[in-house]
């Protein structure tokens, strides 16, 4: 009887721990992956309206470069307007770019959803025929559901290497 009572208490306690956390549906996961894919598409196509639609206004963006690119600099940008301005300014250096973002690992982190995804990106500089840069690393992206859509609240890029 003691074992049964203990087992029952443990089961009820574990249900209570997860009562507030709604599991992600397949539709949620697909929508989250679409946000990540649209991020790459928006940057590559210089579609700043699409880019803006993916984020909350108070987004925090962080770029952590390894020593082979930007000398290992870390950049922190707070707010959507500043983030869009940074992306426009850095995108202006390139004629074209292509972001290949894959292997999204989606998990709950408290109230937020965390997505870790790998990046391999190549950009071709404007006015410098044949000159390009390849950059690889990974993103840690935090999202929340805003009404019916997922939006990014925090986005961090960790550079693992670059080749010019």
What annotation goes with each model-predicted range?
Residues 1-4:
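Positively charged n-region of N-terminal signal peptides that target proteins for export
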Residues 7, 17-18:
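Cleavable N-terminal signal peptides
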Residues 19-57:
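Short, low-complexity N-terminal intrinsically disordered segments enriched in polar/charged residues
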Residues 20, 92-164:
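A beta-strand edge to alpha-helix "cap/lid" segment located at domain peripheries
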Residues 48-109, 113-119:
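A solvent-exposed, acidic/Ser-Thr-rich amphipathic alpha-helical stretch
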């Amino acid at each position: 009887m003691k074992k049964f009572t203990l087992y029952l208490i443990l089961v009820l306690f574990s249900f209570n721990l997860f009562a507030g956390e709604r599991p992600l549906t397949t539709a949620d996961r697909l929508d989250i992956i679409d946000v990540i894919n649209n991020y790459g598409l928006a940057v590559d196509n210089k579609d700043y309206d699409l880019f803006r639609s993916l984020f909350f206004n108070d987004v925090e963006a962080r770029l952590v470069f390894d020593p082979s690119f930007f000398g290992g600099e870390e950049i922190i940008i707070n707010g959507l307007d500043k983030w869009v301005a940074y992306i426009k300014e850095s995108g202006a250096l390139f004629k074209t770019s292509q972001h290949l973002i894959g292997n999204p690992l989606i998990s709950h982190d408290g109230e937020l959803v965390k997505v870790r995804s790998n990046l391999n990106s190549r950009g071709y500089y404007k006015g410098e025929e044949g000159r390009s840069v390849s950059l690889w690393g990974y993103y840690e992206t935090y999202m929340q559901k805003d009404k019916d859509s997922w939006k990014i609240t925090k986005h961090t890029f960790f550079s693992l290497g670059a080749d010019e």
